[in-house]
Amino acid sequence: MKKIYEWEPWFFMFFGLFHLHRIWGLIDRTSYADFWIGILESKGIFYFVLMGILAFLCVCGIATFCKNIKNNYWWRWIYIFGGSYVLFDLFAIAIELKVWNDLLLFMFDVNSQYWNIVWGFFIILGAFVFCLGMKLLKQRKEQI
């Protein structure tokens, strides 16, 4: 039988909110870019706590997908594709992979004509993932 684990709706709502914070980037490009570039360059406690939480959640999601390989919901594929992407992203940032650093600098270029497209996409993704989490929370309550 398919089961939604207690933490799964919160997983999606957390990632959704994390993406939705990018609305700040549409409101104030400079402070948003300065904040995140500062976090990425300083690699202070906030950086390591955030990266640790993101990595832990991705590993949990991928493990859950694998554990339920024969009886998965469609949305658990997000764990594989999204989790793999985030883990690669965290790894590339940690080892300061040049091509990835160049991509991040492009993404945080406040003068880029693509700024609203890039961050708008992440905001839409965040809204979708947050709504998915809310839907899963409702379905989980119906399962109990």
Task: Give residue ranges: language-model regions.
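Alpha-helical membrane-associated segments of multi-pass integral membrane proteins
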Residues: 6-11, 103-139
